[in-house]
């Protein structure tokens, strides 16, 4: 097995390793990405054949600052499989970088925005649905607060530029237990109508959701503009 391929396997199975080992792997990975074009291509090939999207979403921030590389996001296609793939990569990406506090809002949102811009309203809604229900986020209750807030911010951004209050409420009503990330997005994006509509709606339809609304409003005020 080539050393580069071995390192790729290490990177993808590092979740259970001690944090110090993870940090070493992260720094090593950054160095390899910056010096080894072969590994960039190899990683992209292993994750998703003939797609550069994986390379863009998984690269370290030092490379993500390269605007030319960001253009690879235009490789997104319209099928459902790719939406699932892109959404899961985004969640993996933000989780990985958040572990080392390497994440800064503009760079992650840039990737989210570039994917979102390639989709029409229906496709963007599907992408949003996949993102907030992806396998990674199903374990959101175990996520540190800073990671959850970052994911919340990303979901808000994906659903723009034309968020529709009625559509989001309809989506909430489809779920027996509301997802914290969707809920945070709704409250943050619709602060103007929260008191008039959101609380009234929840109070009339679901006491459990009403209580959950109260519990997270304080967190949002503390977080502010994440």
Curated annotation (Swiss-Prot):
**What name does the UniProt record give this protein?**
Late protein I226R
Tell me the organism's taxonomic lineage.
Viruses, Varidnaviria, Bamfordvirae, Nucleocytoviricota, Pokkesviricetes
**Superkingdom, according to UniProt?**
Viruses
Q: Which organism is it from?
A: African swine fever virus (isolate Pig/Kenya/KEN-50/1950)
Q: What does this protein do?
A: Plays a role in the inhibition of host NF-kappa-B and IRF3 signaling pathways. Mechanistically, promotes the degradation of host IKBKG through enhancing its ubiquitination leading to inhibition of both pathways.
Q: Does the keyword Manganese apply?
A: no
Name what induces it: Expressed in the intermediate phase of the viral replicative cycle (immediately after DNA replication).
Protein family: Belongs to the asfivirus I226R family.
* Protein's GO biological process: symbiont-mediated suppression of host NF-kappaB cascade
Keywords for the protein's UniProt record, in alphabetical order:
Glycoprotein, Host-virus interaction, Inhibition of host NF-kappa-B by virus, Late protein, Signal
